[in-house]
Amino acid sequence: MSKKKKIILCCLAALVVVAAVAAVIVYSKLPHALNYPIDKIEPCAHQTVSVVSQDTDTVTLQKNDDGAFRILMFTDQHLNGDNKTGYKTVDRMVEAIQREQPDLVLVGGDNITSGMNRKRSAQFAEIFEQLGVYWGGVLGNHEGDNKYSITRTEMVGIFSSHAHCVMLPGPADIDGDCNYVIRLLDKDGNLVKTIFCLDTFDEISDETAASLTLYDKRTPYDGAHENQVQWYREKAEALKETDGNYESILLIHIPLHAYDEAIESEAFLYGDKREDICSTVYDNGLFDAIQDVGVTQIVFCGHDHLNNFGVQNKGVLLSYIEPSGYGAYGMDRRGAPESEWLQGYTRLDLLPDGVIAQDQIRYAEVFGD
C-alpha cells in the first residue's frame, strides 16, 4: 500500500472515530431521561390494595381496608425529555399521589412521548414502585409516533414488567395494546367497580380514510377498532355471568364522537370546552356497544389539553380527565397566568353504595401555582 493511501485511510479512520465520539456526546446531551430524583421519593403511608388474580385480559384488585376506593387519574403528561417541564410534571404528580393516598392511579395516554424514550418509560414505572402504588391505564396517540421511539408494545412491556403496574397488553387476537379489564373488590370481596381500558391508536392512514365515511374533522384521529369493540361487547356480557348487574368505567385516550354530539344539546355538568373536540373521525360502533351492553356509566378520555368538561349523552357521562402535563400546549399558549392553567388530575372516590364522587382538581388550586 502506498504512503498516500495509508495517509488517506488514517484520515478516514480518524474521522470515523471523531464522528463516533461526537455522536456519543450528542446522544448523552439529548433529553432522553427524566431529570428527577426518583430514588428520593417517599412511599405512600400504607399499601391499601393487593392483586388477587390476573389473566390475559383481566386483573382483580382487592382493597385491604374499609372506606371508599380512591382512584387518581392523570393524562397527557407529555414527558418528552424536557428537563424543566418534565421535572414539574412528575413533581406535581408525585405530590398529588402522596397527598391523596390513592388505592389506584390511572393514566390516560400521551405519558411518555418523543424519541429515545426507553429509559423514560422505565423511570416512569419506577416512580410508582417508589410510591408503592398500583397503576394502570392506556396509551395515547403520541406514544410510539416518533421514529426514534420504542414501539407501543415495547413500552407496555416495560411498564408491565414492574410489580405495581396492572397494565396488560390484552388478547393477542385483537388490535392494539392495553385492551384489558380491572376489577375492583372491597375488603369483603364484593365488586365495587369494573374498569375497561381500550387502545385508540393515533391517526388513520390515507388509505383507511378513503374507505370510511368520515365526520368533518381536520385531523383523522383513530379510535377503537371493530375487533376491539366486539371484544368489549363479549367481555362485558361475559362478566354479567360472574358479577351480576355490575357498573363500569371506560378509559380511552381519543374521545368518542359522542362527545361532539352531546355538546350540541346538553349543558356541561362541570368544566369547560376551550378547544375543538379532536375525536375519532369515523363511527367505530363503540358508543352503540356501550348503549347495548348497558354496564358503562362513565367514559373518561384525555387528548385535548384545554377541555376538562363532563356531559351526559343517552345516560352515559362523557368526561375528560383533567390534563396533567406541562410539556405540551395548554393555557400558557393563550397568555393565561399560571393561576388559570388547567394542569391537574381527576379524583374518583368509589363509595360503598355505588356512587362515584368525582372532582376535577387543578394543581394551581392545591399547590398555589
Show where each model-derived region lies.
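Acidic/histidine-rich helix-loop elements
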Residues: 42-48, 72-90, 112-119, 146, ...
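N-terminal active-site segment of His-dependent metallophosphoesterases
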Residues: 30-123
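Binuclear metal-dependent phosphoesterase catalytic core
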Residues: 25-51, 59, 181-189, 286-293, ...
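His/acidic metal-ligating clusters that form di-metal
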Residues: 101-103, 194-197, 211-305
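Extended active-site neighborhood of metal-dependent phosphoesterases/phosphodiesterases
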Residues: 34-59, 123-243, 343-351
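Active-site environment of divalent metal-dependent phosphoester hydrolases
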Residues: 80-83, 113-116, 137-149, 203-206, ...
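N-terminal Sec-pathway targeting helices
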Residues: 1-18
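Metal-dependent catalytic neighborhoods of phosphoester/phosphodiester hydrolases
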Residues: 84-87, 109-127, 144-164, 262, ...
